[in-house]
Amino acid sequence: MRMSFFDKVKGALTSGREELTRQVGRYKNKKFMQGTVAVCARIAVASDGVSSEEKQKMIGFLRSSEELKVFDTAEVIEFFNKLVTSFDFDLEIGKGETMKYILALKDQPEAAQLALRVGICR
């Protein structure tokens, strides 16, 4: 009986640690997620428009990325739609809004390059 109590405590601690790690990863990688989604939104709007196929490709990458799979798909889609809507309101506002998130990656060259590759190769 003592062993099962300690197993429960250990399980709770492990679960809490995993959740904390997930939350830290989420905070740490939010800028990368926003930059990647901004590149995807900007290229989608500039090319043939925003189709569900474009969204599926972006979501596929985010789900397969160790750094980004901590984000809820609904949150990513909501952010993508927010950026696309800014283009609908005014083209220059949309460009400025996406560049704000893309330029936030300038201090992380590897992350910036990956965000661009994802957007271009989507």
From Swiss-Prot:
GO biological process, one term: response to tellurium ion
Domain of life: Bacteria
Coiled coil is among the record's keywords: no
UniProt keyword Protein transport present: no
Keyword terms: Plasmid, Tellurium resistance
Cross-referenced InterPro entries: DjlA_N (IPR007791), TerB-like (IPR029024)
Cleaved signal peptide residues: none
Biological role stated in the UniProt entry: Not yet known.
Name recorded for this polypeptide: Tellurium resistance protein TerB
